[in-house]
Amino acid sequence: DEFEGEIGGDVKYAITPNLTADLTVNTDFAQVEVDEQQVNLTRFSLFFPEKRDFFLEGRGTFDFARGGSGEFGGFGASDTPNLFYSRRIGLNSGSVIPINAGGRLTGKLGPYAIGLMNLQTAGEASSSTSATNFTVVRLKRDVLRRSAVGVMATNRSVATSGTGTNVAYGADGTFLLTQALTAGTYWARTATTGVNGDDQSYQGRLDYSADRYGAQAEFLSVGSNFDPQV
């Protein structure tokens, strides 16, 4: 009998004590816990938590326009768009899309936190999904006291020729003004094949959190064609 199947695996290599490279081939996510079913009665997409180890490790590096707790000041959820949402890679409506190969570089290089990721997914006839390449680049630096600034860029390309390409890029910052007052801001833009205009998003936000009181003020603008797809 002929052997039918594919060989896959993961390799982790510490380039320096603070910088790690990960390589993956024919990634197997078969053992990942299944998402709980939820009923969505709104026009907005549901965002399920990431459960795959490959994307969980070093995930804080890839946060954009968010503090360490996921929001500027730890308040409730904001309508801030996700410039990078890892579950868009290798999943389609909860169904697994095979990842042929990929690599990731995360850690610290001098004063900078860096994150690089490139993954190639396979086509899936059953879900009409085309083979797609995903790239994410993140650079962040701590400044002043418990503050940070950074830039990020993502690219999703259905073909090497660029057909079906979506690019997103932006800059963000979070600033601790006092022990109780935090400010955050970002600007981002997307470029999608066949779509023009009204493709920017930006935000300014203040969070005040004291022992007994808290408040927040926010200005958020999201263009009708702003559409990060990674």
Which sequence ranges carry the predicted segments?
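Transmembrane beta-strands of outer-membrane beta-barrel pores
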Residues: 27-31, 109-111, 118-124, 153-159, ...
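Residues that define the transmembrane beta-barrel architecture of outer-membrane proteins
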Residues: 3-7, 97-101, 108, 130-135, ...
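Aromatic-lined, polymer-binding surfaces characteristic
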Residues: 112-172
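Residues that cap or anchor secondary-structure elements
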Residues: 1, 29-107, 118
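Repeated loop/turn-to-beta-strand initiation elements of outer-membrane beta-barrel proteins
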Residues: 19-21, 111-116, 144-150, 179-185, ...
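Outer-membrane beta-barrel translocator domains and adjoining extracellular loop/strand segments
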Residues: 35-38, 125-130, 160-167, 194-202, ...
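Residue-level signature of outer-membrane beta-barrel architecture
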Residues: 13, 107-109, 140-143, 175, ...
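Flexible, surface-exposed loop regions and adjacent strand-edge segments
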Residues: 39-43, 202-203, 222
